[in-house]
Amino acid sequence: MASVSLRKLDKSYGALRIVKGIDLEINDGEFVVFVGPSGCGKSTTLRMVAGLESITGGEVKIGDRVVNQLPPRERDIAMVFQDYALYPHKTVRENMGFSLKVRGVSASQANASIDEAAKMLGIEHLLDRRPGQLSGGQRQRVAMGRAIVRRPQVFLFDEPLSNLDAKLRGQVRTEIKRLHQQLGTTIIYVTHDQVEAMTLADRIVILRGGDIEQVGTPDEVYNRPESVFVGGFVGAPAMNFARARVNGDRLAFSDGNSLPMAAIRPSRETGLEGRDVIVGIRPEHFGPAEGFDSQLAVSVQVVEPLGSDTLVHFSLGDAALTARMPPQLRPTPNEELRIGVDPSKVHLFDATTERSIH
């Protein structure tokens, strides 16, 4: 196991700067997930750690070694890819043990490592099969087993679940988390899926346009987003946003609705009077009007019953918002509805910078 340090890490292709001076410390044994939209630099950063991509500037340190100039085989890392990268003509056992064979590990020692990893992943019965005889989920487990037998200091996962269907993604995601609990090895994991990030990570690194937008635990990035981007990216359905103005002790929306400032966390900040802000409210922080002192009068647009709850889409001024409501609440489209809000859960962001007002 080892810590990983990224210092002023930079990557450019000609005049195009992809990764913009990232600073990040990953602790020994930590599970860190890089998440963000396509083109944000997450996979490029991972590939620089792996040695598969040259570094334009800055430093990558694994343990106590600066590895900028080291080839991948000398970095003591193991990588799991999206497309499995298995040899089709080799058995599962041969695929899992190939790197050990190249390193000159004895057959008995290699087989012991393979058997241990296969048992951990529940694929002992597949060891004599070839990749063409396996399902997608089984192939991904083999790819993970191939990484495990190397006993690296750091595991690198590059969108390993993208080729799997929703059910398999959930199963393999659980196995990856259990694997980390058993091995305790440092993991850097790249995904575009915020659900994977929230369920797997000790800490999440949210990237945007080659910069780090926020680093924090799943709880921190969900409940204390530092920007509109983070608030809207993390959570499903996404955080709702609407523009408002601070008028005295009220947060006033353009359609005449308002909320009390006293219960909103940033209200103790000075200089908010008359200020335009972006209001962020998560769907689950709405509720039936009778359960809340603070209420909004809204017009229902669309209703989506989900069994366990109901998603109610409505307009608030010029904004379209979504509320997660109890399953028994079934308003009709175009109905005028009073909806409750928990003001202590309301987030305020600067209308210009879109950064959180703490």
UniProtKB/Swiss-Prot annotation:
Q: Per the record, a Pfam family?
A: OB_MalK
* Annotated binding of ATP, by residue: G36, P37, S38, G39, C40, G41, K42, S43
Q: Which SMART domains match?
A: AAA (SM00382)
Q: Where in the cell is it found?
A: Cell inner membrane
- SUPFAM superfamilies in the record: MOP-like (SSF50331), P-loop containing nucleoside triphosphate hydrolases (SSF52540)
Q: Which GO terms describe its cellular component?
A: ATP-binding cassette (ABC) transporter complex, substrate-binding subunit-containing
Q: What top-tier enzyme class does this entry carry?
A: translocase
Q: Does the keyword Membrane apply?
A: yes
Q: What is its main location?
A: membrane
Q: Which GO terms describe its biological process?
A: carbohydrate transport
E.C. code: 7.5.2.-
Give start and end of each ABC transporter domain.
4-234
Which residues does UniProt assign to the signal peptide? none
**Subunit annotation:** The complex is probably composed of two ATP-binding proteins (SmoE), two transmembrane proteins (SmoG and SmoH) and a solute-binding protein (SmoF).
The UniProt similarity line reads: Belongs to the ABC transporter superfamily.
> What protein name applies here?
Sulfoquinovosyl glycerol transport ATP-binding protein SmoE
The species this protein was found in: Agrobacterium fabrum (strain C58 / ATCC 33970)
Q: What is the lineage of its organism?
A: Bacteria, Pseudomonadati, Pseudomonadota, Alphaproteobacteria, Hyphomicrobiales
Q: Which gene encodes it?
A: smoE
